[in-house]
From Swiss-Prot:
Class of the enzyme per the UniProt entry, highest EC level: lyase
Subunit comment: Homohexamer.
Catalytically driven reaction(s): a 4-hydroxy-3-(all-trans-polyprenyl)benzoate + H(+) = a 2-(all-trans-polyprenyl)phenol + CO2
Membrane topology note: Peripheral membrane protein
Pathway assigned to this chain's UniProt record: Cofactor biosynthesis; ubiquinone biosynthesis
Name the record gives this protein: 3-octaprenyl-4-hydroxybenzoate carboxy-lyase
A GO molecular function held by the record: metal ion binding
Function in brief: Catalyzes the decarboxylation of 3-octaprenyl-4-hydroxy benzoate to 2-octaprenylphenol, an intermediate step in ubiquinone biosynthesis.
PANTHER family, A to Z: 3-OCTAPRENYL-4-HYDROXYBENZOATE CARBOXY-LYASE-RELATED (PTHR30108), FERULIC ACID DECARBOXYLASE 1 (PTHR30108:SF17)
EC number: 4.1.1.98
SUPFAM superfamilies linked to this entry: FMN-binding split barrel, UbiD C-terminal domain-like
Location(s), subcellular: Cell membrane
Gene from which this protein is expressed: ubiD
Sites where the protein binds prenylated FMN: 175-177, 189-191, 194-195
Length: 488
């Protein structure tokens, strides 16, 4: 099922019983977080708070609170279908040379489809139905959540940030949290390796001292939102990928105050500039780790213009100790990652990011082991192949007889197939999420790889244990007489 905009998605979710309207007045300060957290843990519906206390704009929460709704947002009917999206991305990331003329013709429709999904620029758009500029700009009109008791200020969480580097042809989309610090000021918390930060750095080098244009789209259609958090190949724009998911070209409109292009159907758009050198301390905020992060300095965006649809919807979320929405997104996107990794490492059978590991900090990989040291090659590959895993602290590699998604299996493999000294890989001074306060230096720490595979000659000189396997005939016999035994 495809959705033309956020409102279409909301309508379809409501028809399926996947969205609940809350008419009782609810405060964006703490109350919405508590309600959304309880609902998410119960695998409940998306929530539309129609009467947020003190505001006229409704708040949409828990939108991607189940893997099934994430799959729906990506145009899939089931989570299992996300593997096919991963296969497409794997192909586009590293297309294989055709094996012959017939193979070349068979692949041609894929490239035609990608080319056909180039975004379409329109002259008029719903996101600019209402325009607020200059002294009339007031971020206080938005029902921005204060999620946790220790949060320093309201926090914009689902803003789709649009930037463009001076040396790049296409725009970058990224989702960075934004602290509101004034009627027209927000802090842009982008980490140094993220696309927006890199674009801004390049701008400062090429245009020193000049203001840098930025736009933030709130309430885009689900395909565009999810396209921004998916490992899209550098050769494919997030807008084009969203078109592939949606089955129709992404409509964009030029911002009123810059050449940046934003989703035409977005509910709300913030337009502004970052003045080089204008920084502010961000935080503390409760984060996906389950802790409050330390205070750090980031650029300030001066909002010069707010445009929005008539009767807009404000899309919001919270982050906290898993499960939260980022963890649920991780569970769904896990299925997209698997084919991409398998294209590079065909020996990988499964790849799993346990949600309790804060979405990406731990990975479990099962492989068809082929030679001594194979597990170490795979763990090094996980850390280096995709940017999404540069912050993964722990990689556990097991044989394919282990279920990567069953901790009973994984712990059994670790405790029976590992020698802590021989089978542990430690790497110092690697990139680490600055929110990881356990690292000795902000943004820099170590990684651990655990080789929980059966050891081959060359890895051990001892006779290796053989796993106990039940006798099939006995199992069938007991199956036949089980009900007669009266044990259950």
């Amino acid at each position: 099922m495809k959705f033309k905009d956020l409102r279409d998605f909301v309508q379809q979710l409501e028809q399926r019983g996947e969205l609940k309207r809350i008419q009782m007045p609810i405060s964006p300060v703490l109350e919405m977080t508590e309600i959304c957290d309880r609902t998410l843990r119960a695998k409940g519906p998306a929530l539309l708070f129609e009467n947020p206390v003190g505001f006229d704009i409704p708040v949409l929460g828990n939108l991607f609170g189940t893997p099934e709704r994430v799959a729906m947002g990506m145009g899939a009917e089931a989570v299992t279908e996300l593997r096919e999206i991963g296969k497409l991305l794997a192909f586009l990331k590293e297309p294989e040379p055709p094996k012959g003329l017939k193979d070349a013709w068979s692949k041609l429709p894929i490239f035609r489809k990608v080319i056909a999904m180039a975004p379409k620029v329109v002259k008029d758009a719903p996101c600019q139905e209402i325009v607020i500029e200059g002294d009339d700009v007031d971020l206080g009109m938005l029902p921005v959540q204060t999620c946790w008791p220790g949060d320093v200020a309201p926090l914009i969480t689902w803003g789709l940030t649009v930037t463009k580097g001076p040396n790049k042809e296409r725009q970058n989309l990224g989702i960075y949290r934004q602290q509101v610090i004034g009627r027209n000021k927000i802090i842009m918390r982008w980490l140094s390796h993220r696309g927006g930060a890199l674009d801004f750095r390049d701008w400062c080098v090429k245009h020193p001292g000049e203001p840098y244009p930025v736009a933030v789209a709130l309430g885009a259609d689900p395909a565009t939102i999810l396209g921004a958090v998916t490992p899209v190949p550098d050769s494919l724009s997030e807008y084009a990928f969203a078109g592939l998911l949606r089955g129709s070209r992404t409509e964009l409109i030029k911002c009123r105050g810059s050449n940046l292009q934003v989703p035409a159907s977005a509910e709300i758009v913030l337009e502004g500039v970052i003045h080089p050198g204008e920084m502010a301390n961000e935080g503390p905020y409760g984060d996906h780790t389950g802790y409050y992060n330390e205070v750090d300095s980031f650029p300030v965006l001066t909002v010069e213009r707010i445009t929005h649809r008539i009767k807009p919807i404000y899309h919001s979320t919270y982050t906290g100790r898993p499960p939260d929405e980022p963890a649920i997104l991780g569970v769904a996107l896990n299925e997209v990652f698997v084919p991409i990794l398998q294209k590079q490492f065909p020996e990988i059978v499964d790849f799993y990011l346990p949600p309790e590991g804060c979405s990406y900090r731990m990975a479990v990989v099962t492989i068809k082991k082929q030679y001594p040291g194979h597990a170490k090659r795979v763990m090094l590959g996980v850390w280096s192949f995709l940017r999404q895993f540069m912050y993964t602290k722990f990689v556990i590699v097991t044989d394919d007889d282990i279920n990567a998604r069953d901790w009973n299996d994984v712990i059994w493999a670790i405790t029976t197939r590992m020698d802590p000294k021989r089978d542990t890989v430690m790497i110092d001074n690697t990139p680490i999420d600055y929110l990881d306060f356990a690292s000795p230096v902000s943004g820099l720490g170590s990684k651990m790889g655990l080789d929980a595979t059966n050891k081959w000659p060359g890895e051990t000189t001892r006779e290796w244990g053989r796993a106990i396997v039940k006798d099939e005939a006995t199992t069938r016999r007991v199956d036949e007489i089980w009900t007669q035994l009266g044990i259950d």
